[in-house]
């Protein structure tokens, strides 16, 4: 089979670059699970919960009027208390914030997933706003300020997938 599984149609073009967009999108949807790439599912649920009472009408509205840093700090303080409570009772399988941190892109004072960074710069260059992606960056900074983390985690590529799909 040419290309990635799920991205090549049954009548199959031999060049992956010729796969039709609709078939590539369906391939992505059918081959993304909860283990890898699927963390975006949890991210969408997380963001829906965070924004449910904000009155946000459109994710690309740059004049949304929300104080993302304050929202992120409030969440980070609640998360810090939750994490401490869970650790105190011996639960190390407590809920993690989806789509932040990465086993490869870590260990620096401020961490970046280069794939997410590329997309974020691309969005900025094209004038595309996404309040959800901006909120994710507020979250990783607030978690550091609230001493939930020892450094600024990266926002990983699964977050990008989630915020784009959620914006749709």
Predicted features along the sequence, with ranges:
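Hydrophobic alpha-helical bundle cores within soluble ligand-binding/oligomerization subdomains
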Residues: 1-168
């Amino acid at each position: 089979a040419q290309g990635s599984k799920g991205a090549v149609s049954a009548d199959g073009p031999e060049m992956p670059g010729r796969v039709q967009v609709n078939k590539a999108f369906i391939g992505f949807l059918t081959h993304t699970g909860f283990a890898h790439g699927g963390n975006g599912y949890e991210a969408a649920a997380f963001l829906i919960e965070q924004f449910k009472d904000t009155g946000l009408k459109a994710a690309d509205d740059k004049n949304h009027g929300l104080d993302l840093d304050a929202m992120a700090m409030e969440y980070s303080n609640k998360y810090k208390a939750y994490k401490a409570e869970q650790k105190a009772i011996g639960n190390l399988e407590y809920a993690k914030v989806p789509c932040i941190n990465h086993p490869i892109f870590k260990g620096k004072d401020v961490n970046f997933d280069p794939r997410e960074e590329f997309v974020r710069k691309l969005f900025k260059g094209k004038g595309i706003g996404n309040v959800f992606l901006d909120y994710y960056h507020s979250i990783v900074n607030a978690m550091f300020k609230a001493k939930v983390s020892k450094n600024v985690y990266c926002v990983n590529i699964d977050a990008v997938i989630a915020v784009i799909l959620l914006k749709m």
